[in-house]
């Protein structure tokens, strides 16, 4: 026996879902004029409809058809002047069925349809139509799409249009759609730093727009041109004959160009958010430095003493360096570099950017700090074409080594103070390349692994002998730090005393917490005036149980959301359970182990000058 019904969506037993049938039956009312009690007239075409359905689906029609106005009269005809018959047909189908087919429609119809969705208050339809328009952007339709998206304040569609135009700026300038842009939309486009076309091309396109829009204020439009970015020849032979800019404006531009630093000019640059542009895909290349090919190959795993890095000799006048040329001027605010880290060495360095290789602006200065492994660097956004990394110090030899380099623009929020990041999240983690460089533990970085529950009498802590040594944590790079948090070993009732110091170079130390005369247990929160720090040293001065200072966990800055009550689970062993089996003094030298005097004593320390 045949079944005339289409396949139905699966529903759980006890649930009936026939929404698709309801949609079909209500949609069938559009085919004829049965039961219709209102008619819309669009482009001389009549559209019979049903008041109750329109009112149920749309607040606008509810007010129009039941608000006591002329349109609420029985059998009323309502003319609509601000749309097309094609777009209104699509809207009625959506109102009656919840469905709309976009793929077969022209861009002009889709934009009219989007306008109706906005006017009549269908936010879900507005979003879905915007998402589809994002997928079909091209040179011919992007300008009119941007105009509509700007008019109706559609952020996602506006953003996608801007990104498309930024990446195709010169083609957009020469398109027919550019001439039909509204003045507001036009200025929103060309005032963007990321609209990276040559300034001469922008000027000529605006000149053409002014000819096609003679009623607009041309002076306001021409103010969007960045005259100092144009050459003297262009100013005299292209701008001056147009007559749209005064001689004084041209002379001022020449003056700014001749008297300003090159990097102070308001350059335009390509903007590709959240994507590394220091790649061959985007035309980047290493133009200075030794072993150039390794730096941008994307391999951050396969490197050792002899290969997998770029380098330059460290000299006193800082003339050497590793220089990257980007494929085109670009806007960046984030750089990541991987310093060679197969041993415990540290480096110092600075980074500069330029547009012409003559005028350099320093964006990162870590020349007075010791740094290791991955460097995650942030700075105010800059347009640049060249990036230079200059090593100033290596704790092992006179060679500066970089394994990988990345740069991009990121929308991630960050705070800088004195040129250093003020971290919001814990940066004393293994993932952030922090390490314990002094202290005794079964596992070198147990202090930083984030485990604050699984510790006992015999493992998962870091310690040092009172009166000798300390526990020292090295962060991968300097940060502005104003708080730290410790978990002292608390499987019994013992208490500790200690103090904390910070440093940027392991030579000069500043005490930030003095708890030598305080009995301290379990979680310790330490806050102090924010200051630069690459190293944190924790020195125990007293333990009521023995002559060893034990710490289970360290973080900086303090993560308040992770605060643990010291009365809850003082360790997996617990004082009572573990105390029945082990002597607390065993913490000085855990049974069955032979702990090194420092975690790094077994690591290689190559001193090969040719590395």
Curated annotation (Swiss-Prot):
Protein name stated in the entry: BTB/POZ domain-containing protein 9
Coiled-coil residues: none
BTB domain mapped to chain residues: 36-104
Region feature (Disordered): 560-611
Sequence ranges of Low complexity compositional bias: 586-611
CDD domains, alphabetized: BACK_BTBD9, BTB_POZ_BTBD9
GO BP terms, alphabetized: adult locomotory behavior; circadian behavior; modulation of chemical synaptic transmission
Species in which this protein is naturally found: Bos taurus
Superkingdom of the organism of origin: Eukaryota
